[in-house]
Amino acid sequence: MKIPIDIHTHNVPSHPDEAIVNCSPELFVPEKDAWYSVGIHPWSIAESYYGTAVEHALWKKLVEQVRNPQVLAIGEAGIDKLINVPIVIQEDFFKEQARLASDVNKPLIIHAVKATDELLRLKKEINPSASWIIHGFRGKAALATEYLRHGFYLSFGE
């Protein structure tokens, strides 16, 4: 297996073995020779289906999909304080995906917007066995140092 050099894109590139395509459970249809991360992005969380059969079906689908050998990571999971979804709901979705990542021993790709304190607390609370990767890090050196000190990995770019 070639090691992908781009851990986060939304479209299968011309050289699919060089990137990990991020998709939601509803859109995951693996193509030959492509690599994926599958997860529930905070922007995709609908408060209206929280705790319903729709949410249960989504989780069931995600749990099945992450066992596919073409899925190399879970995510993009995360916490985004700039969206209109209560933090408690975002944290519930995040925790479930973090636990799933540890269960299947695959890294968790994280979307983080103004959520450093929450992520540091959740990492301590969950104590994951899987790697946590902050996707598209654009913060200052002090923030990078803080994340690295707590065992996070950082990816750069969009």
Residue ranges and their predicted role:
Residues M1-E158:
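Mid-domain alpha/beta scaffold segments of enzyme catalytic cores
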